[in-house]
Amino acid sequence: MAVIQITSDDTWQIQADGHPLRGTLQVPGDKSISHRALMLGAMAEGTTQITGLLVGEDTCSTASCFRALGAEISPLNATAVTVQGLGMGRLQEPGDVMNAGNSGTTMRLLLGVLAAQTGRFFTLTGDASLRSRPMARVVTPLLQMGAQIWGRQHHSRAPLAILGQPLEPITYYSPIASAQVKSALLLAALHTEGTTLIREPHRSRDHSERMLQAFGARLSVDEATCTVSLEGPAVLKGQKVIVPGDISSAAFWLVAASIIPDSELLLTNVGVNPTRTGILDVLWAMGAEITLENERLVTGEPVADLRVRSARLKSTRIGGELIPRLIDEIPILAVAAAFAEGVTEIRDAAELRVKESDRLKAVATELQKMGAKVTELSDGLDIQGGGPLQGTHLETYGDHRMAMSLAIAALNAKGTSEIHNASAAAVSYPEFVTVLQQIA
């Protein structure tokens, strides 16, 4: 068995021994769906019941903000959460600054909601990482709708102040495929008189569209043109929401079982929404042995059990319209590439530079420390795979996906690795290291 220890200074020590991974796992609830269930539940009339919610730092930030806005949300847990909604346009003006923590989803989607709360004033901030992340991509189209938003660097950085206004519908051609931009505008459009149309260059994840329709919004999607239209004003009704497991969390185990010989894992109840399954398409292209079992539809979302067995991986190219479907999985795919035969090329991923860390730089730096041959490009990486990695001192940059990706790399490296600032994993997967200790 691998030796995995958690030290008092927020460090994971991982000494690998090549032991195969075996077992059945249930990954935590989908983070994107969990955020949206809390938000729509707070804006809807009546009660929303949520099963399978992710209880992580990001979703706790969303719950905290909406409690400050007057919504009644029961203590967060994965079994059952109840949200007593206030109804459209009835969120209350809080008496203090709201803090989105590290959660870009919380801040960007909240901007769309708050901009439409006529006559009420809000201030929104976050941690140091979030305050450095770009908000203009959401603020700019909201200003076109009539929003009043102020902030640092020409209203592009938090803290941000919002004075709710009567908004107008718009037609917006987004320069990037971003579910956060699209969702913020849809949440604002719920309060307008008329039809808002949003077109993207590629499809982005569509959890907002699916859930808005379930809550009663008049929304249509043209997949051929990557266009969404919403007719406002809307009246949302509370719903029962079952949150599937997060494929972004499952990705770590899919790669781990693929690269560690003689491994086999069954990941149950994982969301396989086609706007999120780029990770599967890439791993299949690399030769991974992954099968979908017990496929079904749960509250409007495709769900399956994923069985993964170890396989000999080969290099591939990742870019173009694939990127929005796996943007969060690129760090762990880079780990897979380090163990694959040949050179894997990642392109069109400049968005990774403005995530919780500069993930292109972080991935290149840390894998190079382990002996991988990685070339950092402006919008991607070239990774020469096939060589053994060596355990060493590694840094997460306070980024949850970096912490877990490096842990999987360390699990198949020679010697001992120390991963510093590892508690960042709690943002999306608080139980990750416990599960790692159990199966490794």
Curated annotation (Swiss-Prot):
Assigned GO CC terms: cytoplasm
Cysteines engaged in disulfide bonds, as pairs: none
Pathways per UniProt: Metabolic intermediate biosynthesis; chorismate biosynthesis; chorismate from D-erythrose 4-phosphate and phosphoenolpyruvate: step 6/7
UniProt: 3-phosphoshikimate binding residues: 31-32, 36, 178, 180, 328, 355
GO molecular function, one term: 3-phosphoshikimate 1-carboxyvinyltransferase activity
UniProt subcellular location: Cytoplasm
Pfam families found in the cross-reference section: EPSP_synthase
Keywords: Amino-acid biosynthesis, Aromatic amino acid biosynthesis, Cytoplasm, Transferase
Catalytic activity: 3-phosphoshikimate + phosphoenolpyruvate = 5-O-(1-carboxyvinyl)-3-phosphoshikimate + phosphate
Top enzyme category: transferase
One GO BP annotation of this record: chorismate biosynthetic process
Active site annotation, chain numbering: 328 (proton acceptor)
Subunit structure: Monomer.
Family: Belongs to the EPSP synthase family.
Entry function: Catalyzes the transfer of the enolpyruvyl moiety of phosphoenolpyruvate (PEP) to the 5-hydroxyl of shikimate-3-phosphate (S3P) to produce enolpyruvyl shikimate-3-phosphate and inorganic phosphate.
The protein, known as: 3-phosphoshikimate 1-carboxyvinyltransferase
Species whose genome carries this gene: Thermosynechococcus vestitus (strain NIES-2133 / IAM M-273 / BP-1)
